[in-house]
Amino acid sequence: MEEILMHEIKESDWKILRELLTVALERFCRQILSEIKQIDADSAKSFHQKYLDIFRLVQRRDREIARVFNNPSRSTALIQLAEMQSQGLLSADEYLRFSQGTRNIIAHLLGTETAGGK
């Protein structure tokens, strides 16, 4: 795995990733806001409990946002792309824009390789 992480993303894939960062961040924030709405809609909980649940959720999700989106660089791009893919932040068409080599690395990182490496 270390040898994979030492590789930088291809220039063409880096350009695609930079294009998709804003879209993926918007999707992630939409997911988080949806989770907040679900917590708020729970009439069985007190307002204070809802507040505490939302606070914890935002803290946890903020760490995830930082891991996936903060300080994008070519040296961390493969990990960030793997995180985006694992969070379901890219559509199938968006993901297929990346080279087969990059998709193979992401599949390896996520443990989703199939027979034949595809």
Identify what each model region corresponds to.
Residues E2-K118:
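Acidic, Ser/Pro/Thr-rich low-complexity regulatory regions
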